[in-house]
């Protein structure tokens, strides 16, 4: 099938995202890992087939101009991030809605996804820019965390939640989904707000999430150094200083 690549929506170092009719085309750079692309498509398919969540339907994995592409259903609407920017006076209302949607996701289970503790352990062991003492403390803390099997999106941020014209919602970008601990997913969302220079919103989010979920904030905070280390392993230069603030601690009390 031929796709029209004139309407570029997003550009990233490793991929561009296009809209072509009712399709979203995620086109990766040449020589991008075939394993990673197929794994992303597999994750999306597993969530689609094993839950009742509204997510883009996976349509095909193909090659376009010698580059790998994932083609999915296009979801019409505004993201929660866009709505917050359009109507700042309603930001608190949208943030509460955002948390409700996240808790809906976390109430589901997809048993064939990778386990979050296995993924995080591998990433921390691969991280070269922390001391052995910090690595040991992080791995000990990770090992002590409860083994849960909740569906964790892994990149649950307002730009990945689309509110459709009929006010139904859909969740996009499932590349990082795993099964694991609710608090880990919340810690990841919190850290995303921090990295986006939204510290006040990060704290507001954390309080709302704790209140709605019934989880003690301290339990979520215990995951933050772990999640920061995992993100540090990705090697984004612009994030390193912030992430080290959370990782470079000895006493994780």
Model region roles, listed by residue range:
Residues 4-38, 45:
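ATP-binding glycine-rich loop module of kinase domains
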Residues 15, 188-253:
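Helix-rich C-terminal or lid/interface subdomains of diverse kinases
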Residues 16-19, 140-184:
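Active-site acidic catalytic loop and adjacent metal/ATP-binding pocket
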Residues 42-54, 105:
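Structural motif at the C-terminus of the N-lobe alphaC helix and the adjacent alphaC-beta4 loop
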Residues 48, 89-116:
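Internal "kinase-insert"/substrate-recognition segments embedded within catalytic cores
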Residues 57-68:
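Short beta-strand micro-motifs within the conserved protein kinase catalytic domain, predominantly
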Residues 66-79:
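Conserved short submotifs of the Hanks-type protein kinase catalytic core
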Residues 107-154, 164, 245-253:
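An alpha-helical support segment within catalytic cores of ATP-dependent transferases
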């Amino acid at each position: 099938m031929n796709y029209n690549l004139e309407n570029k929506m997003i550009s990233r170092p490793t991929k561009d995202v296009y809209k072509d009719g009712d399709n979203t085309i995620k086109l990766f750079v040449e020589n991008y890992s075939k394993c990673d692309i197929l794994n992303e498509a597999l994750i999306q398919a597993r969530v689609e087939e094993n839950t009742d969540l509204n997510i883009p339907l996976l349509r095909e994995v193909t090659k376009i101009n010698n580059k790998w592409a994932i083609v999915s259903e296009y979801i019409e609407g505004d993201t929660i991030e866009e709505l917050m920017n359009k109507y700042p006076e309603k930001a608190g209302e949208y943030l509460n809605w955002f948390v409700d949607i996240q808790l809906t996701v976390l109430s589901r289970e997809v048993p064939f996804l990778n386990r979050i503790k296995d993924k995080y352990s591998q990433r921390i062991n691969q991280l070269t820019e922390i001391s052995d003492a910090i690595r040991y403390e992080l791995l000990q803390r990770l090992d002590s965390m409860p083994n849960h099997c909740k569906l964790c999106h892994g990149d649950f941020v307002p730009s990945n939640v689309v509110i459709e014209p009929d006010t139904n919602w859909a969740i996009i970008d499932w590349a990082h989904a795993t099964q694991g601990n609710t608090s880990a997913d919340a810690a990841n969302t919190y850290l995303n707000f921090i990295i986006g220079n939204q510290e006040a919103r990060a704290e507001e989010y954390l309080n709302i999430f704790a209140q709605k979920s019934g989880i003690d904030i301290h339990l979520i905070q215990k995951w933050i150094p772990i999640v920061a280390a995992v993100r540090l392993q990705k090697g984004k230069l612009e994030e390193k200083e912030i992430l080290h603030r959370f990782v470079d601690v000895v006493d994780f009390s």
